[in-house]
Amino acid sequence: ELGAEVIGVALDPFSERDNYVLSGIGSKIKADLRVDIRDGERMKAIFREYQPEIIFHLAAQPLVRLSYEIPVDTYATNVMGTINVMEAIRATDSVKVGVMITTDKCYENKEQIWGYRENESMGGYDPYSSSKGAAEIAIASWRRSFFNPVDYGMKHHVALASVRAGNVIGGGDWALDRIIPDCIKALEAGKDIDIRSPKAIRPWQHVLEPLSGYMLLATKMWEEPTKYCEGWNFGPRAESITPVWDIATDVIKIYGSGKLNDMSNPNVLHEAKLLMLDISKAKFQLGWKPRMNIHRCIELTVDWYKRYKTEDAYDICLDEINQFINE
């Protein structure tokens, strides 16, 4: 609605109930392309054809437990896919801004009781987390080697930054091993909700929170190309960093029905128990801050799932965006 010409590059949707499918986004943008980012030459060809100016790179294999099953594919997508996007940027003169989205799990997790800052070590126990840490290292290398702010205007015209969000929730997500989709699937089927890691603490936030940060950052990078080419955290308020059990309990209250089962198992695949982000940098240097508390984030998310069967998904999204803007 703001007038941007959007070109989308992705694999097929996860399900026919995805927000992307139900809201008909593919028919509302300039181009909707089915491409695997592991195909570097195809990515370069797309960039040559469409001559984009701003890149938001979100494509990934995003699931921790699945990464144990397909570690090579996870690395190929999350590391080499990211490099392919940066190489396509490097080969296309039209690109001026690149915002590379990774994850809060890119940090070497020490289960510390304070939030990670942007200058802390990259790492990761599982293939997913470590692949994102590796992607961050690659982004930093490409920024220093090919998109160095010192050389802007002489050797290149690209501002490149990376962003790390917390655990994102929102309507229309049906992915595996995610707490909100798992809750909704069980509730719709009239079943109890099984919680495998009830005490795990995460920085929960509604999807519109980090997206607003990404867009603000891209705008500032466009206006001042050498000032913001760094890593940035976009996380929730401190009180929104809560255990999985509390999230599921709130979902049940808002949805109006349901029962939780504690399915804790010490023998399951390793997942971090405690993860928090420090967002001071984005607050003070960008003027960004989260608008909603955790209850409001869950309320807006559950609202989508309660409405999507009887209302137009695109209209629901516009309504929720307007609610978010007015928070």
Task: Give the label of every model feature segment.
Residues 82, 176-181, 214, 248:
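Amphipathic alpha-helical segments in well-structured domains
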Residues 44, 87, 181, 249, ...:
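Active-site phosphate/pyrophosphate- and oxyanion-stabilizing loops and adjacent acidic/basic residues
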Residues 25-28, 119-121, 145-160, 183-195, ...:
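A short C-terminal helix-loop "cap" of Rossmann-like NAD(P)-dependent dehydrogenase/epimerase domains
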Residues 18-21, 110-113, 173-177, 207-208, ...:
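Short aromatic-enriched loop/helix-cap "lid" or pocket-rim segments at secondary-structure transitions
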Residues 3-9, 35, 167, 187-327:
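C-terminal substrate-binding subdomain of Rossmann-fold SDR/epimerase-dehydratase oxidoreductases
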Residues 40-41, 53, 65, 72, ...:
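Residues in well-ordered alpha-helical elements
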Residues 1-165, 169, 324:
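N-terminal Rossmann-like NAD(P)+-binding domain of SDR-like oxidoreductases, especially those catalyzing
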